[in-house]
Curated annotation (Swiss-Prot):
Transmembrane segments: none annotated. It comes from the Bacteria. Belongs to the ATPase delta chain family. The keyword Transport applies. This is ATP synthase subunit delta. PANTHER family: ATP SYNTHASE DELTA CHAIN (PTHR11910). It is found in: Cell inner membrane. SUPFAM superfamilies: N-terminal domain of the delta subunit of the F1F0-ATP synthase. F-type ATPases have 2 components, F(1) - the catalytic core - and F(0) - the membrane proton channel. F(1) has five subunits: alpha(3), beta(3), gamma(1), delta(1), epsilon(1). F(0) has three main subunits: a(1), b(2) and c(10-14). The alpha and beta chains form an alternating ring which encloses part of the gamma chain. F(1) is attached to F(0) by a central stalk formed by the gamma and epsilon chains, while a peripheral stalk is formed by the delta and b chains. GO terms for cellular component: plasma membrane; proton-transporting ATP synthase complex. One of its GO terms (molecular function) is proton-transporting ATP synthase activity, rotational mechanism. F(1)F(0) ATP synthase produces ATP from ADP in the presence of a proton or sodium gradient. F-type ATPases consist of two structural domains, F(1) containing the extramembraneous catalytic core and F(0) containing the membrane proton channel, linked together by a central stalk and a peripheral stalk. During catalysis, ATP synthesis in the catalytic domain of F(1) is coupled via a rotary mechanism of the central stalk subunits to proton translocation. It comes from Cupriavidus necator (strain ATCC 17699 / DSM 428 / KCTC 22496 / NCIMB 10442 / H16 / Stanier 337).
Length: 180
């Protein structure tokens, strides 16, 4: 994981720089394209083709580009060819993640992972996200998961910060206090 992140970082930073300076579209359109590229590269069939040494690079790039549904500009085509030429197409999912982090940093926003013991309804989720935005002082994009093992409450992760108000964590804290 760390090795993949190290390999992907310069590509993500270069692509972000190109996207920021490009007149071919806004950062949102680039973000959607890069996310799609990451999803396609993560596909097991595409991984198998990318890992096959018998597939020529130009054919691999052509195949990859043909699978994408988003409109492509010349910069994106050259980027894919660069990845293929350097044998780094399989790193595209990590490049997409790092591109997204760079975009969020530019916009002053973050992703938030909310894990709840029960499904959150629309107003509950909106109120929770609004409270978290006030706490963290930036726009948050929520990804919600349900984990019944929490028993009750929620666990929130924004970047490297974790707020765990679940019943499970409170019980674990009580157990630690009682056994100490």
């Amino acid at each position: 994981m760390a090795e993949t992140a190290t390999i992907a970082r310069p590509y993500a930073e270069a692509l972000f720089r190109v996207a920021s300076e490009s007149s071919a579209g806004n950062l949102g359109a680039w973000s959607e394209l890069v996310s799609e590229m990451g999803q396609v590269a993560a596909n097991p069939d595409m991984k198998a083709v990318a890992g096959d040494p018998n597939v020529p690079g130009d054919k691999l790039a052509e195949l990859f580009l043909s699978v994408l549904k988003s409109p492509l500009n010349d910069e994106a085509r050259r980027f894919v060819k660069l990845l293929v030429d350097n044998g780094r197409l399989t790193v595209m999912p990590e490049i997409a993640e790092q591109f997204h982090v760079l975009k969020n940093a530019r916009e002053g926003s973050s992703d938030v992972e909310i894990t709840s013991a029960f499904p959150l309804e629309g107003s509950q989720l909106n109120d929770l996200v609004a409270a978290l935005e006030r706490k963290f002082g930036r726009k948050l994009y929520a990804q919600v998961a349900v984990d019944p093992s929490l028993i009750g409450g929620v666990s929130v992760k924004v970047g490297d910060e974790v707020l765990d108000t679940s019943v499970r964590s409170r019980l674990a804290a009580m157990q630690a206090t009682l056994t100490a």
